[in-house]
A protein has these predicted regions:
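Cytosolic regulatory regions of ion transport systems
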Residues: 1-195
């Protein structure tokens, strides 16, 4: 996959490093010449020095053949502009990092109107993850589905706990909330209970 990353801060460098390990063809764009040269030579990737929102800079980076452009500069507006230009110049998928709190309620609108594949707000994602963990502190794992309306939880039932030796039908009837136990794991055995 040919991926262009605009912005070589910590996030951009980490993305470039991790994605290059997966045999992707990575090109980075940043206006800091030394940073681009050092990073590109260290990881054997293509580096372009310039403004990532410039059409000519994106063309030099190979936007016409790119599958994906990820904009992670320090400016939300620059990230969005980079993605808009990439979408028009190369018709590739685009991902923008948007951190400004004022935009958080407008992320879906921004994503749809600009044709972005994804909008990432790292701070909001971290806060959501912390809130999920705090919501179910004894859960081993929490996955959320259906726009946060469904939580899939994994618990370890400890010996002599309230749930130990309790029948599944009793668990669902005695707990508050809408609960469906979809699987029980005992060692290597997975049991799917009948309703």
């Amino acid at each position: 996959m040919k991926i262009i990353i605009v912005g070589l801060g910590k996030v951009g460098q980490t993305l470039a490093f991790e994605l290059s390990k997966e045999d992707n063809d990575i090109t980075v764009i940043d206006n800091r010449e030394g940073v681009v040269q050092d990073f590109a030579s260290q990881y054997d990737i293509m580096g372009v020095i310039g403004n990532g929102s410039s059409y000519s800079t994106q063309m030099e980076a190979g936007i016409e053949a790119a599958d994906l452009l990820i904009a992670v500069t320090g400016s939300d507006e620059l990230n969005l502009l980079c993605c808009l230009i990439a979408k028009k110049a190369g018709n590739c998928h685009t991902i923008a990092r948007v951190r400004t709190p004022e935009y958080s309620s407008e992320l879906n609108f921004i994503k749809e109107e600009l044709g972005l594949a994804m909008v990432i707000n790292p701070e909001m994602a971290a806060a959501d993850e912390i809130a999920r963990v705090l919501k179910f502190p004894s859960a081993i794992d929490v996955d959320t589905f259906s726009k946060s309306r469904v939580d899939l939880l994994k618990f370890r039932v400890l010996e002599h706990s309230v749930l130990d030796e309790m029948r599944i039908s009793d668990i669902t009837s005695k707990t508050k909330g809408n609960i469906l136990i979809c699987a029980v794991e005992r060692g290597e055995q997975l049991i799917i209970p009948e309703r």
